[in-house]
Amino acid sequence: MSAVRSKICGITRIEDALAAAEAGADAIGLVFYPKSPRAVTVLQARAIIAALPPFITTVGLFVNASRCELNETLDAVALDMLQFHGDETPEECDGYHRPYVKALRVKAGDDIAGVCRTYRNARGVLLDTYVEGVPGGTGETFDWALIPDDLDKPVILAGGLTSANVAQAIAQVRPYAVDVSGGVEKSKGIKDREKILAFMSAVHGT
């Protein structure tokens, strides 16, 4: 099996982005959802991206953003990939002509395979924990047994991952990538360098 990729999401500070890169993360996530405690402005995002070393993928997270808002962000910020956490339709996601992943908050009875088929142009599906009224960043895990074995898209596993459980998650789910936010924080939006290092060591089995 190929090495599992990793994304540190909810980055709000340059020092946290650099800590993620130095620890071996493949990507960082920048939240463009004003209601989130991890939200960044365009100016913050540009400063963070400008400080990154080469080959770190920058992912912009959006929740039901208007086309105007999203286009303004894309014009101002050099994002490599989009991540949609709201009720965006496949047509809306496709309309920006950027690589994207679609997030699904998983609960019993969800047709995850059907979502993958519906969002046929998505590069992957991000599976997160369902908490009513919260689009992501809950800090809670979900039942990984709900994930089908035969999905036709790369799975990015999120939801309550920490250095204590990510190795088990990788062994059970065998995802393409893992995504962490709260599990490597001191407080919402403020990352902890030691927690990032511990998480990445667990991902890499070192």
Swiss-Prot record:
InterPro entries: Aldolase_TIM (IPR013785), PRAI_dom (IPR001240), RibuloseP-bd_barrel (IPR011060), TrpF_fam (IPR044643). It is an enzyme of class 5 (isomerase). SUPFAM superfamilies: Ribulose-phoshate binding barrel. It holds the Pfam family PRAI. The keyword Transport does not apply. It catalyses: N-(5-phospho-beta-D-ribosyl)anthranilate = 1-(2-carboxyphenylamino)-1-deoxy-D-ribulose 5-phosphate. NCBIfam families: PRK01222.1-4 (NF002298), PRK01222.1-6 (NF002299). Belongs to the TrpF family. PANTHER family: N-(5'-PHOSPHORIBOSYL)ANTHRANILATE ISOMERASE. This is N-(5'-phosphoribosyl)anthranilate isomerase. It comes from Pseudomonas syringae pv. syringae (strain B728a). The lineage of its organism: Bacteria, Pseudomonadati, Pseudomonadota, Gammaproteobacteria, Pseudomonadales.
